């Protein structure tokens, strides 16, 4: 399977003022693109049984870059311009679940932001569905580790490349801002698929 950098479904400046054009361009064109290229290169080397190059274990590097690519591909779909679907939680199954589990969107944001801001170093904040009881849960993963115990509904990149140029080291400001461009339509589609096994 080829690793392909996904096109963004919006312009680089479409998430302003919450995420700057500069961040989006660098994050997508450089960081996300590099993950794809590295994963592809490692895959080619491993196909030819070159597992270690210059002291680096390419099988591990392949896994790390592939996981980063998967997380970022989900992240890009997670976002939408505030002038469109961004930040708009409409009535429906996801809103009902958020109300039932967290007592409303504001409470979800507060709990999610507190949990995610607590990550030491780089990682991801997640809202996911527990497959055993179909309930929403908040979780975090370090580095580019995937969300294994939950089905991802919303993922937020908390690596510095996602926010530092605009928010410096104030993670809380970035986390508060990103909710204005969360694509809740996509989140609801994922939620319905995770809980009912059907697609909207």
From Swiss-Prot:
Leader peptide range in chain numbering: none
UniProt cofactor(s): Mn(2+)
GO molecular function: manganese ion binding; superoxide dismutase activity
Superkingdom as given in the UniProt entry: Eukaryota
GO cellular component terms, semicolon-separated: mitochondrial matrix
The entry's keywords: Antioxidant, Manganese, Metal-binding, Mitochondrion, Oxidoreductase, Transit peptide
Binding site for Mn(2+): 27, 72, 157, 161
SUPFAM superfamilies tied to this protein: Fe,Mn superoxide dismutase (SOD), C-terminal domain, Fe,Mn superoxide dismutase (SOD), N-terminal domain
Name of the featured protein: Superoxide dismutase [Mn], mitochondrial
Organism from which the protein derives: Agaricus bisporus (White button mushroom)
């Amino acid at each position: 399977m080829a690793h392909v950098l996904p096109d963004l479904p919006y312009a680089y400046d479409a998430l302003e003022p919450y995420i700057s054009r500069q961040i989006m361009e660098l994050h997508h064109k450089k960081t996300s693109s590099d993950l794809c290229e590295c994963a592809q290169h490692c895959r080619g080397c491993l196909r030819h049984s070159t597992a270690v190059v210059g002291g680096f274990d390419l099988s591990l590097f392949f896994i790390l870059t592939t996981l980063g690519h998967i997380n970022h591909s989900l992240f890009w779909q997670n976002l939408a311009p505030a002038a469109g679907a961004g930040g708009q939680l409409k009535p429906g199954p996801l809103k009902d679940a958020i109300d039932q589990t967290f007592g409303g969107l504001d409470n979800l944001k507060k709990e999610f932001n507190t949990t995610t801001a607590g990550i030491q170093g780089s990682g991801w904040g997640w809202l996911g569905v527990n497959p055993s009881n179909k309930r929403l849960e908040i979780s975090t993963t370090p580095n580019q580790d995937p969300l294994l115990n939950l089905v991802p509904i919303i993922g937020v990149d908390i690596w510095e490349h996602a926010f530092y140029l605009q928010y410096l080291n104030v993670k809380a400001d970035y986390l508060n801002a990103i909710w204005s461009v969360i694509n809740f339509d996509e989140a609801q589609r994922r939620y319905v698929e995770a809980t009912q096994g059907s697609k909207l």
